[in-house]
Amino acid sequence: MRTATKTRVTAETSIELSINLDSQVESTISTGVGFLDHMLTLFAKHSRVTLNVKADGDTYVDAHHTVEDIGITLGLCLKEALADKASINRYGSAYVPMDESLGFCALDLSGRSYLVFDAELTNPKLGDFDTELVEEFFQAVAFNTEMNLHLRVLYGKNTHHKIEALFKAFGRALREAITINPEIKGVNSTKGVL
């Protein structure tokens, strides 16, 4: 089983996160940031992983530290669970519609960190959630997983729908990339390592 558990404690947050890439049971997610709980639940469902997150953070300031530190911890868990990345597809991509919005994700578990985030999130807040934190979250995930991650909203009007399409697309693309392919011997790279 490809699993990982991490605890990250700073002066601003305390994060406990575990992931199982090969088993999907109901995830338990409690971050103190309601909108992020919703998005992480969607991500877990569409990536077909079990994700457990317990976070306490300085949300009385705002959600920035909590969102970023969860992204860091998720990225570190993904990196550990994937280990040497033997026999995985490595690449994944997905288009996901959410009503009037269309989101796209392409990723490469290459060992090289990069984020391209192309999404016009016209509403700066959804409830108490600052929508600029979506990019911060994905930046933290990409750099700590060491993945090349491209996210784009092709069109849409509703900011909630745009973000939801991105999280679902990320989940579906990740599932494709982490799937073990019996036709791939070793790692999917001419270098011999990822």
Curated annotation (Swiss-Prot):
Reactions this protein catalyses: D-erythro-1-(imidazol-4-yl)glycerol 3-phosphate = 3-(imidazol-4-yl)-2-oxopropyl phosphate + H2O
Subcellular localization: Cytoplasm
Pathway connected to this protein: Amino-acid biosynthesis; L-histidine biosynthesis; L-histidine from 5-phospho-alpha-D-ribose 1-diphosphate: step 6/9
SUPFAM superfamilies: Ribosomal protein S5 domain 2-like
Family: Belongs to the imidazoleglycerol-phosphate dehydratase family.
EC code(s) of this entry: 4.2.1.19
Database matches in Gene3D superfamilies: Imidazole glycerol phosphate dehydratase, domain 1 (3.30.230.40)
Example GO molecular function: imidazoleglycerol-phosphate dehydratase activity
InterPro entries (UniProt xref): IGPD_sf (IPR038494), ImidazoleglycerolP_deHydtase (IPR000807), ImidazoleglycerP_deHydtase_CS (IPR020565), Ribosomal_Su5_D2-typ_SF (IPR020568)
PANTHER family: IMIDAZOLEGLYCEROL-PHOSPHATE DEHYDRATASE (PTHR23133:SF2), IMIDAZOLEGLYCEROL-PHOSPHATE DEHYDRATASE HIS7 (PTHR23133)
Name of the protein in question: Imidazoleglycerol-phosphate dehydratase
HAMAP family: HisB
One cellular component (GO) term of this entry: cytoplasm
Source organism (scientific name): Listeria monocytogenes serovar 1/2a (strain ATCC BAA-679 / EGD-e)
Keyword annotations: Amino-acid biosynthesis, Cytoplasm, Histidine biosynthesis, Lyase
Root EC class: lyase
